[in-house]
Amino acid sequence: MALVLHCGSGNKNAFKALIAAEYTGVKVELTKNFEMGVSNKTPEFLKMNPLGKIPVLETPEGAVFESNAIARYVARLKDNSSLCGSSLIDYSHIEQWMDFSATEVDANIGRWLYPRLGFGPYVPVLEEFAITSLKRSLGALNTHLASNTYLVGHSVTLADIVMTCNLYYGFVRILIKSFTSEFPHVERYFWTMVNQPNFKKVIGDFKQAESVPPVQKKAAPPKESKAKEAKKEAPKEAPKPKVEASEEEEAPKPKPKNPLDLLPPSKMILDEWKRLYSNTKTNFREIAIKGFWDMYDPEGYSLWFCDYKYNDENTVSFVTMNKVGGFLQRMDLCRKYAFGKMLVIGSTPPFKVKGLWLFRGQDIPKFVMDEVYDMELYEWTKVDLSDEAQKERVNAMIEDQEPFEGEDLLDAKCFK
């Protein structure tokens, strides 16, 4: 009998076995019309996996569950498969990277994503920990891939299949470009893998996530008691204007506009400034800085300095940089209305964190102060443009001038 993979289409854990099958030539059939919550609750399915989890591979010798175990089984059905390496050390390194992918990459993507989708409580501190852990893991992966095309050896192995499938889930759900661009070798590796014919045949075409999913808010409990009371009080004989009442009650409320969209039009087009900033590669001060002040509208926008209040805690460089990166991720909700530069300053700890922000309007937007908890960790000072020293400081921060205020720059990040 052919191998049967019990799972819905589009599942990244099923992709692992299906891609391995493309490399080995093993025939694996994906069950048709699989319905999660129904198909995996049948007595037949529960005999194969008592927990009802997917995927499950049905073989002539019995069922196999857990996606990595299934992928191993498919890969080893072909003698001397290159997917499993050519030596004991290759095999060990493949297992090493498969474990790393599961515990350091996939797990941290899930810890960041699932609470935002409502699968568990959303706790900002735990999210920050998940993001920091994921960045640390991707940093290690990035270092390895700086000098390696594949995770192990000189061709695709099972380690690459598992890693790519786990990264795929992150790329399509939560890992936006501004996040992944910090790991250029991981990006290069990922896009190279998913465009390999055997990967592409299974995964198909897709786009990288453009925004981090918003936190799902719990729906208000239905007011059953009031509805029942109203029902009792209503006279049976009295005619009810059913259609009109239902239309009024069910009419969707118009989505409230962002207060910043109601401000008077500004001569400054923020996207034009962002394009100028991104496209200026030489003579930055003469082109980009001059262009900024030519565009700047002091009535429609305001500039703000921010200084981290707890710099004495910034004793580890990568933790400090990850802290700033997490802040910028959470600022994504105001990308339409803001531009920012964040600098990590100093060659030895404790490191200083300072920033410059351009916001629509004359104040820091209220929805940013309400939603981004990092805001209260910084001291905010509005830039006084009548002070030439402050204006020059703006220039230096936009330009990533080094040294900055007499100190080395450890890192500079841009929010645009």
Curated annotation (Swiss-Prot):
Keywords: Elongation factor, Protein biosynthesis. The keyword NAD does not apply. Residues 1-82 form the GST N-terminal domain. Residues 256-416 form the EF-1-gamma C-terminal domain. Signal peptide: none annotated. It comes from the Eukaryota. Residues 221-245 have a biased composition (Basic and acidic residues). SUPFAM superfamilies: eEF1-gamma domain, GST C-terminal domain-like, Thioredoxin-like. Coiled coil: none annotated. The keyword Protein biosynthesis applies. GO terms for molecular function: glutathione transferase activity; translation elongation factor activity. Probably plays a role in anchoring the complex to other cellular components. EF-1 is composed of four subunits: alpha, beta, delta, and gamma. This is Elongation factor 1-gamma 3. The lineage of its organism: Eukaryota, Viridiplantae, Streptophyta, Embryophyta, Tracheophyta.
